Every structure is written in structure tokens, then in C-alpha cells.
A protein has these predicted regions:
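Catalytic-core regions of glycoside hydrolase
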Residues: 267-269, 278, 282-417
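An active-site-proximal structural segment forming one wall of the substrate-binding cleft
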Residues: 207-220, 241-267, 294-308
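Boundary/entry segment of secreted carbohydrate-active catalytic domains
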Residues: 129-187, 192
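Short, solvent-exposed loop/linker segments at beta-strand-coil boundaries, enriched for Pro/Gly
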Residues: 64-68, 72-80
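C-terminal motif of bacterial Sec signal peptides marking the signal peptidase cleavage site
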Residues: 15-18
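Active-site groove signature of glycoside hydrolases
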Residues: 226-236, 254-291
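Aromatic-lined substrate-binding rim segments of carbohydrate-active enzymes
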Residues: 174-232, 244-246
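Extracellular/luminal regions of secreted and cell-surface proteins that mediate adhesion/ECM remodeling
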Residues: 435-558
Length: 558
């Protein structure tokens, strides 16, 4: 047949086609890149803003049977519960407007590739005023508490002691000495570093190491530092401070240390200028500044300090007028709830009054009533502290308590002036002052819903801040569930303790217990010193604070 000449052996055809007669379809598992799309989808996502208190049901659909995970980024305000069959209940409740971000992920299988979906739900806050008031009815199991009337040694508040360092030859503080300060009621120590030996030169490496050694001791001993630098204590000294350029060089030298010890520095007093670093008797910064040009050297120093100190920390100026004049501020420019703690220059400049109650104007601390009004408003959001300096009719107990409240005092020196302190003790207000400097959180009650493993539980905490001020540095708030199996589950409370001002406060949050039985704690920890119980806040209630863990027991489910 003519067609035979076109026939080719089968093996040759296979070879020409690049195949082998023994080839068979591959049964190997394809790579993730080759896997099919599982068509992961989420139903029930609202297209519009939802009101706080809304309960949503989310249903996840997918062709794959890979493991599913659903999570929210704000568990304090969005409780998530698995209902089974790929259904989830989401309950949202927030005092302010928020976006709740939800992520859904599914593992890859032999047939389908991994999948993920992310979406956001806008939640309208109920408003701070809509949080339960002190006498409002609250649902759930109620737990009440008894106030601990003793003064409590809490971090970053209270009475302070002082320690001076005059040269690099001095032995730094020992940890034992620091711990002994705590036992006498001091969680704050004013470290006064005198730079007399360096008034015309750079700081020595040895002196800088001495500074660091003192701060190391404070950290290990559980105390924080109020830091001040100065050049002399002598009002008759020929040179009361260094040249402006020298001071700025010293600040630059100190910057690495200030950055390194952010965790243990409570606040930095502006210092450097004048006798004791109090910005008054000065040789090089203008004794009585009036014009913007007069204030220029002090502003140069303040700007340098703002740059040298971590943004989380504040700098105290000796009078409100310094802040107003250097930064062209009027009474209307005081810090508000919106601008507080936003990292701006204005939000980071605080004050210290080292002649508290000495006379009508506290020995020049206040130029006029505007200056007083400025500090009254500003200190709601910035650190205020200092010491007394002379007995007068302005430091009688009733006026003293009013001023401490009005100016939101956080700390006070209990070593000076002894006449004033003795008067407060004999007149019966010293103990009250010791108790209420800074914050003092007293639980009123807690209400919680039924506790079931794996199910979000709503908890309402009502408390009073009986202190003169709110906490001022960043602080975390955690709900800590310790299950009956001993395991710990932590969830952020969702509130900033710096907003817990004097008076009544309340919070509403969620936690998801891992077991049906266990204990719920509130931990108010220092974010830069995690796990340090001595730097955690103790609530002023009996039988609540655990000194070993730094936790405050809210309730136990047995």
C-alpha cells in the first residue's frame, strides 16, 4: 500500500514528541502555586457603620476543608465566639468610634491553596458619657471591694527623696540603698547631677558612666528617677552655669544615656541653668528675660533636651511663663484631651514648683493669674511636682489640699521644707497628701457575664481615682485570665490609664477565658519594664494586689 511509507514506528513518534513510552500521569502533590482557589468568602459583613452593642453573625464559606482562623485586632471592644459550622458571633462595644479589623485565614490542603480575607467594620462609639455611671444598674455577677486606706508605694508617684552626685569620684548608689528607699515609701528619687568640674570642658567618660551606674541601681531596685543637671549650688559662685555652647555640648553627650535609660527616667527637669539648675540666678542665660531674643538661649536648651530625651518622656520647666514665652503660647493654647500625649512639644513640657505655698505667687513661680490658669489646665495632662520652701499662710492645710488638686500634683519632696511638713503633720493633712499624690485607683465594683471556656465575656469595671492626677507616662492595661489549669491568657483592656483622671471612671471590655473556672486579674504594667511587679500599679483595695506578679485580683470563678 502506498500509505506504508508514511508509517513511523510508535517509539519514534514518542521520541519525536519528547515523551517516553513508560511515561504515566504524575500523582505528585502540586505546589501551592498550582493549587486551586478555594473561593474563600465571608458573609454577614455590614456595609455601613454599626452601633455599639450590635451582635453580628459571620459565616465563612469555602470549597476547602483547611483549618480556619478568625481573629480581630481589638479584642477588648470586639468579642468573637465560634458557633460551629464555620459561623462566628461578633459583639462590638466601644466608648469611642473605632474600626474593628477582622482577618480570616485558611490553611492549604492537597487540593486548595491557602486563603485569606481581611475586612474592616466601622463601629460608632457609645461615648464616654454613656459608660455606666456610679449609680447605674449594670448586668452580670457583681463583685464589690473594700478600700485600703494606707498609703501605697506605687510607681511614678508620691513622696520623693534626693541624691546628689558631684564628681566622677563618688561611689554610685547601691541597689540595697535604693531598695531601702522603697521600704520607706519612696518610688521616686531626685538624682541631681552636678557638673561643676566640667563647666568649661566636655564631660568625662567616667562621669557619664557614674550617671549610668546610678540609673542601673534604680532600675534594679525598683525606683524611678526625676533627673536634673546643674553646675553649682553656690549662690555666690562666680560662674553659676556654663556657656550656652558648652551646655548644648553636654546635652549632646548625655543624649545616648537619656535614650538608654528611658525606662527608669520618670521625668527630666530642664535644669542646667542657674544655681541648683532652677533657671533663676544665672551667668549665661539672661537673669531676667523679657524679649523673645532674651529667651533664645533657654529655648535652645529646651529644644536640645526635647531632642535628647525619648519622645515618651516629659521635661519640666520651673514656671509656666517659660513655656508660654519660649513657645508663644496663650491661655487658650493649653493642652486638651485631643492634644494630650500626642508627642508634640507642647504636650511634652511640664512643670515643677520648688517654692510651693511660700506666698501669693510662690516666690515668683507665677507672674500673674494667667500663669496660674495656664498651669491649672496644662497639668491635667502633664507632670507636676516639686517641694516647699517656706512657711506662710498659703501653706495651711485647706489651701494646700486645694492647690494640690487644682494643679494635679504627682510628686512632692518629703525632705524639705521641714517647717512646712511639720505643720501639715500637726494639722492633720500630711497623710492625706501622701495617699493622694498622683493617682490612687480604688475599685467600686466589677460586673461580669457568665464565664464559659472559649466564649467572650463582657466585664464592667467601676472605680475612682482619689488621687490628684492621672498616670502620666505610657502604661498598659491588661485583663489576665488564669485558668484552673494554671495557664495564663492575656488580653488588652483597650483603655489608656493616662485618661483616668481624678474622680469616677468606668471601663467596659471583653476577655475570652480558656477554662470555665479561674481568676481574672487587672494588670497595669510598665510597657518598658514588662514582668516587673514593682513597676506595676497596685489598686487601693484590700486583698487585691499580688506583689509577686503585679496583678490585681478582680474575681474568681470556682
Amino acid at each position: 500500500m502506498k500509505t506504508l511509507k508514511y508509517l513511523v514506528p510508535l517509539a519514534a513518534l514518542l521520541l519525536l514528541a519528547g515523551c517516553n513510552e513508560n511515561d504515566k500521569p504524575s500523582t505528585d502533590t502540586p505546589t501551592k502555586k498550582e493549587l486551586a482557589d478555594s473561593e474563600l468568602a465571608v458573609n454577614g459583613i455590614p456595609s455601613q457603620t454599626v452601633e455599639s452593642g450590635t451582635s453580628l453573625t459571620l459565616t465563612v464559606t469555602s470549597k476547602s476543608d483547611g483549618n480556619l482562623r478568625v481573629a480581630v485586632d481589638k479584642p477588648a471592644f470586639a468579642g468573637l465566639e465560634s458557633l460551629g459550622n464555620n459561623e462566628y458571633k461578633l459583639y462590638v462595644l466601644s466608648p469611642k468610634d473605632i474600626d474593628v479589623n477582622v482577618s480570616v485565614t485558611q490553611d492549604a490542603t492537597s487540593e486548595y491553596k491557602a486563603g485569606s480575607k481581611d475586612f474592616s467594620i466601622k463601629v460608632k462609639g457609645i461615648g464616654e458619657s454613656a459608660l455606666p455611671g456610679p449609680n447605674d444598674s449594670v448586668t452580670g455577677t457583681e463583685v464589690t471591694y473594700t478600700e485600703n486606706t494606707a498609703a501605697i508605694v506605687n510607681p511614678e508617684r508620691g513622696l520623693y527623696a534626693t541624691h546628689e552626685i558631684h564628681s566622677d569620684k563618688e561611689t554610685p548608689l547601691g541597689v540595697g540603698e535604693v531598695k531601702s528607699r522603697r521600704t520607706t515609701g519612696h518610688s521616686l528619687l531626685l538624682l541631681e547631677f552636678y557638673l561643676t568640674d566640667y563647666i568649661g570642658s566636655n564631660l568625662s567618660a567616667k562621669y557619664v558612666k557614674n550617671i549610668q551606674a546610678n540609673l542601673d541601681a534604680l532600675r534594679e531596685g525598683g525606683v524611678k528617677a526625676i533627673v536634673r543637671f546643674a553646675y553649682t549650688q553656690d549662690e555666690n559662685a562666680a560662674e553659676k552655669d556654663a556657656e550656652v555652647e558648652t551646655v548644648l555640648k553636654h546635652v549632646a553627650q548625655l543624649k545616648p544615656t537619656l535614650q538608654k535609660y528611658e525606662d527608669v527616667i520618670f521625668v527630666l527637669q530642664a535644669g542646667f541653668v542657674g544655681v541648683w539648675g532652677e533657671w533663676y540666678y544665672t551667668s549665661h542665660f539672661g537673669f531676667s528675660p523679657k524679649s523673645a531674643n532674651d529667651y533664645k538661649p533657654r529655648k535652645q536648651l529646651t529644644d536640645a533636651l526635647l531632642d535628647a530625651l525619648p519622645a515618651s518622656r516629659q521635661i519640666e520647666l520651673r514656671t509656666p511663663t517659660f513655656k508660654m514665652k519660649m513657645y508663644n503660647l496663650a491661655l487658650k493654647d493649653t493642652i486638651t484631651a485631643v492634644t494630650a500625649h500626642d508627642g508634640s512639644i507642647v504636650s511634652r513640657l511640664a512643670g515643677h514648683n520648688d517654692c510651693f505655698g511660700a506666698d501669693k505667687n510662690d516666690r515668683g513661680t507665677f507672674d500673674d493669674d494667667n500663669a496660674r490658669q495656664f498651669w491649672m489646665a496644662d497639668t491635667r495632662y502633664t507632670i507636676m511636682g516639686g517641694e516647699t520652701c517656706a512657711v506662710s499662710d498659703y501653706c495651711l492645710c485647706p489651701q494646700t489640699i486645694k492647690d494640690l488638686e487644682d494643679y494635679h500634683w504627682t510628686y512632692l519632696h518629703d525632705g524639705y521644707n521641714q517647717e512646712v511638713l511639720s505643720r501639715w503633720k500637726s494639722d492633720g493633712c500630711f497623710n492625706e497628701i501622701e495617699q493622694n499624690l498622683g493617682y490612687r485607683f480604688v475599685l467600686q465594683d466589677v460586673h461580669y457575664e457568665a464565664v464559659e471556656a472559649g466564649k467572650p465575656c463582657k466585664v464592667t469595671i467601676r472605680f475612682n481615682n482619689n488621687g490628684y492626677a492621672a498616670p502620666m507616662n505610657p502604661r498598659e492595661a491588661w485583663l489576665v485570665w488564669k485558668g484552673s489549669d494554671g495557664k495564663i491568657v492575656r488580653s488588652l483592656l483597650g483603655y489608656d490609664p493616662r485618661t483616668w483622671h481624678s474622680g469616677y471612671n468606668s471601663v467596659v471590655s471583653f476577655f475570652t477565658p480558656s477554662t470555665d473556672k479561674g481568676k481574672l486579674y487587672l494588670e497595669l504594667s510598665d510597657p518598658l519594664l514588662p514582668g516587673r511587679a514593682d513597676y506595676s500599679i497596685a489598686l487601693a483595695n484590700t486583698g487585691v494586689f499580688e506583689a509577686k506578679t503585679g496583678y490585681n485580683l478582680l474575681f474568681e470563678v470556682q
